[in-house]
Amino acid sequence: MENSMTLPKIKQVRAWFTGGATAEKGAGGGDYHDQGANHWIDDHIATPMSKYRDYEQSRQSFGINVLGTLIVEVEAENGQTGFAVSTAGEMGCFIVEKHLNRFIEGKCVSDIKLIHDQMLNATLYYSGSGGLVMNTISCVDLALWDLFGKVVGLPVYKLLGGAVRDEIQFYATGARPDLAKEMGFIGGKMPTHWGPHDGDAGIRKDAAMVADMREKCGEDFWLMLDCWMSQDVNYATKLAHACAPYNLKWIEECLPPQQYEGYRELKRNAPAGMMVTSGEHHGTLQSFRTLSETGIDIMQPDVGWCGGLTTLVEIAAIAKSRGQLVVPHGSSVYSHHAVITFTNTPFSEFLMTSPDCSTMRPQFDPILLNEPVPVNGRIHKSVLDKPGFGVELNRDCNLKRPYSH
């Protein structure tokens, strides 16, 4: 362990990508939508593009997997390295190597907040309210936390102040909540398959899916719907009421990110006891403050897209101040180390990436080595007791470094 007064400086930052439109298809990794054929995650799931028949059957048909995985590695002067992955691919590599590098190299490995603030402010003129640029900044931020943990010999969750519970319990996102129940998860979240362009028939079909799973899973197992920005307020409200008899726990991301008034109206008109949730495609701290003010029940930032761990901690504080939960969108170890320190995250999400949801596959497979998966729906804090985020980069993947500096 390094003496706290002599922490090393960062020598270099490097960026690779794998998968996406300019590399091999089905690479998986940080871009978990980049899967092969016959995978549940690409099977007639409702999206904002579903209203166009040419793009209704497959999300890959409209390009959901064009970005690919971004891998950022930071190296300290003592030779230690930290890394992280997200969804930004080749374009993220350009941003890291040609712009953000100047804010990283030469800084102390503990200067995470300074680097974060400089990256955010230096990209304001082209980052908008999130998206590719924020994904890239998030990836750098996570890599910095990984490096800091490895330098001082501590897991990231201890750098954040330590665990507030002994284990994390998970619900599973996938097409088969009935299988998730058998694996020990506390609930199952299904994608919707129909949208406003399908009219009331679409509502009946998705409600029938919920009814079928309720019968298979029993009364107490949580069931939720992920609507992936595909609806309008009227349709979402009608769908929520159609699913109420089957004890739907929450309805998620019905509307596009900026429709704050719509979320306020949906929460106001949703069935009593049914939660309204959103947040995975919100990309700034300010957007989460506004989202929080709509009164939704759970905010769901993705730590690889919202600004990184540094921003996620701030979002959790906003939610806590309003009595709201923060349950991050997937993100594996990058979420695990955060949520085990949050008092307002009583459970977390595990995204099923096996094609038929029948086996436990790590979310970012194959890019991470030693990536933990829940056992009987849980991960004990002792599993996280490794320096940094506790995973290593699989350098046998087809990594490409298109830029340097």
From Swiss-Prot:
It comes from the Bacteria. SUPFAM superfamilies: Enolase C-terminal domain-like, Enolase N-terminal domain-like. It catalyses: L-rhamnonate = 2-dehydro-3-deoxy-L-rhamnonate + H2O. The lineage of its organism: Bacteria, Pseudomonadati, Pseudomonadota, Gammaproteobacteria, Enterobacterales. Mg(2+) binds at residues 226, 252, 280. Pfam families: MR_MLE_C (PF13378), MR_MLE_N (PF02746). Its EC number is 4.2.1.90. Substrate binds at residues 33, 59, 349. The keyword Lyase applies. Homooctamer; tetramer of dimers. SMART domains: MR_MLE. Transmembrane segments: none annotated. The active site is at residue 329. The keyword Lyase applies. Binds 1 Mg(2+) ion per subunit. GO terms for biological process: amino acid catabolic process; carbohydrate catabolic process. This is L-rhamnonate dehydratase. Catalyzes the dehydration of L-rhamnonate to 2-keto-3-deoxy-L-rhamnonate (KDR). InterPro entries: Enolase-like_C_sf, Enolase-like_N, Enolase_C-like, L-Rhamnon_dehydrat, Mandel_Rmase/mucon_lact_enz_CS, Mandelate_racemase_C, Mandelate_racemase_N_dom, RHMD-like. Keywords: Lyase, Magnesium, Metal-binding. The record marks 349 as: Transition state stabilizer. Belongs to the mandelate racemase/muconate lactonizing enzyme family. RhamD subfamily. Its cofactor is Mg(2+).
